[in-house]
């Protein structure tokens, strides 16, 4: 039985991530950008101990109407709820004089006042004590910019090291296609965040770097199989580069799918059973693992095959 020609249909497989990325770009502009968390744009985060059922939407609506602070993000935690409020620095700048707004002490005071308003409203509504405030932290927008800069730097370093490693182990074309596949994975992850308007924070950066390392492993497995099977190439017998790559993909597909499924089961359990902080890490991992498996099978090796074939044809013409 003749197996489906994956290499021949490479552009059809590219269509799926292309549609997701396009949808992400559209939603990015519709939403006015990503939903950055306080680590990136500044704000206050606190954790409050609360017993019983916690309706986060009800608490959010109550706090926004009672304090006049918006937006407020409320999430459940193991011990109660976590509360995040963003754009506090911008609010402080509007409410203070222009020269005073640049003073960090004024901005910190504004953050403390808003945090105090939120907790006092909760205390009154739900009859809490001062001990219910488990933790409180704040971040400035300038700190957020530093975090973003470091995130891009670390990602770029990781990609360059991967490019170098694969170029040494295989060849430079394999390295280029592997990096392109990685970039597609990252774009898909960011697109899903734009579509779902999920808060983008430092946990996403950690998950993204994890996915980069995980997905490249699947790509290496496929390229390793291709390298082994290239010894059997015989154009006179119809065993071309495209044939070898298609066979190699099918031979390594079972391993890739099995590894991906077992990994996904673990991550899904973490997402379903974990607290908010665990869910924040598991969600991008789910997206990245699926995207990584897809790109390693249907994108990296297939487009490498087309590139390799066209390069060899060009050499023949020159001769």
Name each model feature, range by range.
Residues 1-319:
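A structural signal for conserved, well-ordered secondary-structure elements
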């Amino acid at each position: 039985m003749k197996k489906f020609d994956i290499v021949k249909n490479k552009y059809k497989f590219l269509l799926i991530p292309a549609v997701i990325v396009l949808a992400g770009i559209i939603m990015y502009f519709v939403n006015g950008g990503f939903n950055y968390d306080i680590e990136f744009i500044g704000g206050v985060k606190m954790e409050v101990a609360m017993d019983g059922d916690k309706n986060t939407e009800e608490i959010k609506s109550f706090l926004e109407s009672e304090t006049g602070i918006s937006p407020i993000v409320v999430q459940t935690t193991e011990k109660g709820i976590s509360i995040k409020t963003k754009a506090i620095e911008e609010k402080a700048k509007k409410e203070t004089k222009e020269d005073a707004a640049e003073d960090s002490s004024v901005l910190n005071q504004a953050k403390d006042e808003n945090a105090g308003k939120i907790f006092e409203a909760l205390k009154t509504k739900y009859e809490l004590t001062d001990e219910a405030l488990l933790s409180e932290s704040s971040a400035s927008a300038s700190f957020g910019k530093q975090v973003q800069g470091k995130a891009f730097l670390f990602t770029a370093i990781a990609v360059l090291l991967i490019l170098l490693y694969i170029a040494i182990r295989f060849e430079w074309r394999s390295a280029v296609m592997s990096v392109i596949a990685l970039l597609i994975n990252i774009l898909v992850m960011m697109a899903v965040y734009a579509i779902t308007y999920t808060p983008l924070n430092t946990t996403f950066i950690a998950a993204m770097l994890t996915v980069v390392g995980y997905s490249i492993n699947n790509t290496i497995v496929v390229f390793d199989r291709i390298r082994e099977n290239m010894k059997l190439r015989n154009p006179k017998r119809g065993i071309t580069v495209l044939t070898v790559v298609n066979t190699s993909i099918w031979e390594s597909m079972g391993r890739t799918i099995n590894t991906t499924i077992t990994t996904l089961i673990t991550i899904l359990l973490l997402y379903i059973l974990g607290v908010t902080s665990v869910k924040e890490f598991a969600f991008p991992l789910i997206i990245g693992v699926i995207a990584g498996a897809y790109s390693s099978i249907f994108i990296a090796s297939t487009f490498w095959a087309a590139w390799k074939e066209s390069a060899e044809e060009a050499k023949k013409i020159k001769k």
